[in-house]
Amino acid sequence: MALTLMKGSEAIAEAAIRAGARFFFGYPITPQTEIPEYMSARMPEIGGCFLQAESEVAAINMVYGAAGTGARVITSSSSLGVSLKQEGISYCAGAMVPAVIINVMRGGPGLGNIQASQGDYFQGVKGGGNGDYHLLTFAPASVQEAIDLMMIAYDKAEKYRIPVLFLADGIIAQMMEPVELPEMVDYKVDPEKKPWACTGWKPGDDPAKRGVINSIYIDTESLAIHNDELQAMYKEVVANEQMWESYNCENADYIITAFGTVARVAKSAIAQLKEQGINVGLVRPITVWPFPYDAVREACTQPSVKAVLDVELNEGQMLEDVKLAINGAKPVDFFGHCGSQMPSTDEIVAKILSMKEGK
């Protein structure tokens, strides 16, 4: 298939359409505004629905309603906009409504800036809204990977009835890369495969099949039972849906852990260090929830590994999960920046050399 040069945000939007999304609800905010801009033109072309909501809060509740019918629905925002969506995201998780949410992360906290960041890891992975819930959370490192993950996102969301979150950063959204676009999925809502969906109820129909979707359980025992069902589902996701990349890890002297675009910078640093005779590997979680604890532990606790370096475009958020995985078996150091200053290849090389010298 031919390659097409596309901006990341537009490629993500097109991939969602090709995966069967026919409803987009959102609100403009930099650096993801190209997603709703693209959808505003593309959705009408394929008979879909684009609606610019009056706010992020309204947009996520529109997602809740439309996804409750069994349709494939998507919304996107950036950081503080996703913060505004958290109540509705918790509703979707609590009601087990599958949907796709894109967070093109920007600098923070507060208004921050409009440059790239990975500062929303805690929000995405640990649960930004209220209650005990998780989102299946992807952290793509390239435009092509974002496309490929989008093509499986709805299938995973519907299999488990779980919202899917993309933790992308402003670099992926704004960069242009050659990509291979998949064929269009012929998706139609099948009530037999989605008996939970609200597909309409008329007088005379069986009341038991009218389909009520909600996340409120006034009776304490009912809420406890529902939460037990959620936790059982999350265990299935943890068991079956972990994704990661191991790069040059066998017999490595040092292991770098990183996610998203930072991992690409880390690979450049690994190449430079190899020229200096230092063997460095990389473990890159592709799903940050569920986090691939076993894979990280296996790579980082090899006898050859002297220490682990976690590199992020924040002040050390995934670092906590890396430390949990390693559990004190190896020293773990951190290098990162806030303020949207991407760690450079030279900085990562210098940090590894410093660790080698025991500094």
Model-found features: residue ranges?
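Conserved thiamine diphosphate
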Residues: 115-170
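Generic long, charged, amphipathic alpha-helical segments
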Residues: 266-299
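Glycine-/acidic-rich phosphate or pyrophosphate-binding loops and their flanking alpha/beta elements
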Residues: 7-11, 232-254, 267
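Conformationally flexible catalytic loops at phosphate/diphosphate-handling active centers
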Residues: 161-246
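Thiamine diphosphate
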Residues: 1-127, 134, 142, 338, ...
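Peripheral docking tails and interdomain loops at the edges
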Residues: 312-359
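Short beta-strand segments
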Residues: 100-105, 138-140, 165-169, 312, ...
